[in-house]
Amino acid sequence: MYAFSYSTPRTLDEVSAAS
């Protein structure tokens, strides 16, 4: 999950949207 955050999104909000 954290690996994806470093892939593109920077904030938790972006991570949620990317998921």
Curated annotation (Swiss-Prot):
GO terms for molecular function: aldehyde dehydrogenase (quinone) activity. Keywords: FAD, Flavoprotein, Oxidoreductase. Its EC number is 1.2.5.2. The keyword ATP-binding does not apply. It catalyses: an aldehyde + a quinone + H2O = a quinol + a carboxylate + H(+). Heterotrimer composed of an alpha, a beta and a gamma chain. This is Aldehyde dehydrogenase beta chain. The lineage of its organism: Bacteria, Pseudomonadati, Pseudomonadota, Betaproteobacteria, Burkholderiales.
